[in-house]
């Protein structure tokens, strides 16, 4: 009799334990479903300006041979990468295409092909860099995706390898991988890192227009008596830490082309000088104009005035080279 009683007790205990375990499993599953995605990475994509931009001629491959001093600035997009069943790119700007034509999408596909992995990620881009502005906004987002997937997949690729991959996406992408200050040659993809400049303050303004980079280069090819900036002297000044020497040598051979066709750019330049920014120059093929200021307060005052004139405007500072 005692034997059967113990058997009955053990059966009840076993049933309770089994039921409790099942409930715990259900609870764990519910908790897992409520959790954030396992993988979530955030990258900052800094805008770039050209401190110096010279065009040396047209290459056999139809690209232009350039020599530039490129500089990263703190105006930046935020790129968030999370796990997803399939590759998807979204932005907080409805006018910005997030599908396969987006450079960030192309960067994810390229990285997946290189790593032989499916890029099952959702990439969300919070835009703060002006669109179509000559500030490498799309290129810096693509570079951020390269860095982010390099971290996520633990590939351990150095900056130089990511830069070579980025060159397949666009001429500005290699610089945007690590940023800082750099001499760019070739079509812009051959980089020589330079010492970081101090965090100088600047104000930027963009008129409501878009400039086609191919158009700017085609128009440049028609120019006579081009005044070329002293890129070699600027590089020497950067290496010597001679900030006044750097600022004296600002120059962009595309500015007369774009400003000649769009007088608004010259007007912004004159306004910035009148309000206290100096020196002032257009970045890349335009239309964004930037000017250096003594302090952030001055920059914010000028930006406020320019915004009242229906211009996009922001204050930023120079930022150094990042680790990858």
Report the location of each language-model feature.
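ATP-binding N-lobe of GHMP and related small-molecule kinases
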Residues: 35-133, 151, 155-163, 197, ...
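ATP-dependent small-molecule kinase catalytic core of the GHMP/sugar-kinase superfamily
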Residues: 40-44, 48, 52-68, 155-279, ...
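Glycine/serine-rich anion-binding loops at beta->alpha junctions
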Residues: 124-153, 171, 278-293
């Amino acid at each position: 009799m005692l034997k059967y009683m113990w058997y009955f007790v053990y059966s009840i205990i076993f049933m309770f334990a089994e039921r409790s375990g099942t409930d715990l499993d259900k609870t764990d599953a519910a908790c897992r479903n409520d959790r954030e995605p396992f993988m979530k990475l955030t990258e900052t994509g800094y805008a770039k300006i050209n401190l110096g931009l010279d065009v040396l001629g047209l290459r056999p491959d139809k690209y232009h041979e350039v020599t530039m001093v490129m500089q990263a600035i703190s105006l930046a997009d935020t790129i968030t990468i999370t796990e997803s069943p399939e590759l998807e790119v979204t932005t907080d700007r409805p006018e910005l295409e997030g599908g396969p034509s987006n450079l960030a999408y192309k960067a994810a596909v390229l990285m997946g092909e290189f790593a032989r992995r499916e890029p099952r990620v959702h990439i969300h881009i919070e835009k703060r860099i002006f669109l179509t502005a000559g500030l490498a906004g799309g290129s810096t987002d693509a570079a951020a995706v390269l860095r982010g997937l390099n971290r996520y997949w633990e590939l351990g690729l150095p900056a130089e390898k990511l830069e070579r991959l980025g060159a397949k996406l666009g001429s500005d992408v290699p610089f945007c991988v690590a940023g800082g200050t750099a001499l760019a040659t070739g079509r812009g993809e051959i980089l020589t890192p330079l010492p970081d400049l101090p965090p100088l303050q600047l104000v930027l303004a963009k008129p409501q227009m878009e400039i086609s980079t191919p158009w700017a280069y085609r128009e440049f090819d028609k120019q006579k008596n081009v005044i070329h900036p002293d890129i070699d002297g600027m590089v020497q000044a950067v290496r010597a830490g001679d900030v006044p020497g750097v600022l004296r040598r600002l120059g962009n051979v595309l500015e007369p082309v774009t400003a000649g066709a769009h007088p608004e750019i010259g007007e912004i330049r004159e306004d910035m000088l009148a309000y206290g920014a100096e020196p002032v120059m257009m970045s890349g093929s335009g239309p964004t104009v930037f000017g250096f200021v003594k302090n952030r307060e001055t920059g914010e005052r000028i930006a406020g005035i320019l915004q009242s004139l229906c211009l996009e405007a922001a204050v930023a500072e120079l930022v150094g080279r990042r680790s990858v």
